[in-house]
């Protein structure tokens, strides 16, 4: 309970504010309240306070280069993720689209805290639920496709249908190619492809 004192008081303690801010500093994707809103006297104030602390902390952090590099480049997957974020900045892309079976690609991109929205496109309800808690990611349901090109085309179609992109927009697509990725069962386990596409 990060703002525990707000169960009974309209303002948190300084230590509680520091706890929330430190969670953001540490790269936490999601923070939540429990007793403060379930049984507290000031549930609305608690939500506003937590949101305010998170927004102020992120606003401060985004000025630091380390904030966007926090994902770290440890392997090919993370190198592709870092490259996708860098490319999206350089080409002034509208968003980053991640066709994914497991949600791993979207999580990988999220680690680098891009300035653009990340759209996870998955046929898996499980993956969609998981990505809801990842920083900066919004998930949408797609249909199962056989090839990488069909998967990417389908993801762009879903993005257009939801009004996420429009004709002429540049988008960065990052995914795993099942032809060249090591796989485990039906799940692609390696992110190894990034491309830029213009919406037609």
Language-model-derived ranges and their functions:
Residues 1, 23, 109, 171:
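Conserved, mostly hydrophobic/aromatic
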Residues 6-28, 53:
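Flexible glycine/proline-rich, aromatic-decorated loop/lid segments
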Residues 20-43:
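Glycine-rich phosphate-binding active-site loops on the catalytic face of alpha/beta enzymes
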Residues 34, 59-70, 94, 165-170:
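Flexible, glycine/charged-enriched surface loops at secondary-structure junctions
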Residues 37-59, 185-196:
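C-terminal helical cap(s) of enzyme catalytic domains, especially alpha/beta-barrels
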Residues 49-85, 193:
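Long, charged amphipathic helices and adjacent flexible linkers at domain junctions
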Residues 105-107, 113-150:
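Nucleotide-binding motor/catalytic cores of P-loop/tubulin-like NTPases across gene-expression machines
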Residues 138-141, 153, 157, 182-200:
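Beta-strand/loop-dominated core regions that host nucleotide or nucleotide-derived cofactor-binding catalytic loops
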